[in-house]
């Protein structure tokens, strides 16, 4: 799976925060159907990645701290610790015994080209566009 449940939950949290207001974890969990324990884990990552700001106390809550137009799906996946790798052999430092024995691997070359296109596509989609659907939510041709 390229986009994990964790990144899906992160997108849902960001969707709640689109309004620019502070929201409690309980509110976001209830609205977006995210288990509380996962919401806290995800918010820690989003905060560490400077995508959200979390404040504690009576007036605390969570709010956006990034520009969603300048932040891509690729960026979010990186914050969540995902690389969206198509195949294990795309991982840096992967040792392929087949390639060691036979040389160039056509499968790897084709997958590398697909990986590059996927990464470019994920970099081209801003989180705001993804979360709001842009001008026409049914039109995914430019995503």
Question: Which residues make up each language-model segment?
Answer:
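Key DNA-contact positions within bacterial/archaeal DNA-binding proteins
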Residues: 37
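Append "Primarily bacterial transcriptional regulators
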Residues: 28-30, 46, 76
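Basic amphipathic alpha-helical segments that dock to polyanions
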Residues: 42-49
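N-terminal helix-turn-helix DNA-binding core of bacterial DNA-binding proteins
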Residues: 3-34
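Beta-hairpin "wing" of winged helix-turn-helix
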Residues: 49-65
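Non-DNA-binding regulatory cores of transcription-related proteins
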Residues: 65-143
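Solvent-exposed interaction patches of small proteins and small membrane subunits
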Residues: 25, 31, 56, 65, ...
């Amino acid at each position: 799976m390229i986009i994990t449940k964790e990144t899906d939950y992160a997108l849902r949290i960001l969707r709640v925060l689109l309004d620019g207001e502070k929201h409690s974890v309980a509110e976001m969990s209830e609205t977006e159907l995210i288990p509380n324990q996962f919401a806290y884990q995800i918010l820690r990552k989003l905060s560490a990645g400077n995508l959200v700001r979390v404040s504690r106390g009576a007036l605390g809550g969570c709010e956006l701290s990034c520009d969603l137009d300048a932040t891509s799906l690729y960026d979010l996946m990186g914050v969540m610790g995902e690389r969206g790798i198509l195949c294990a052999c795309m991982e840096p430092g992967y040792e392929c015994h087949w390639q060691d024995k036979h040389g160039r691997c056509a499968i790897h070359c084709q997958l590398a080209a697909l990986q590059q296109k996927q990464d470019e596509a994920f970099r081209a989609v801003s989180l705001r566009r993804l979360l709001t659907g842009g001008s026409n939510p049914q039109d995914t041709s430019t995503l």
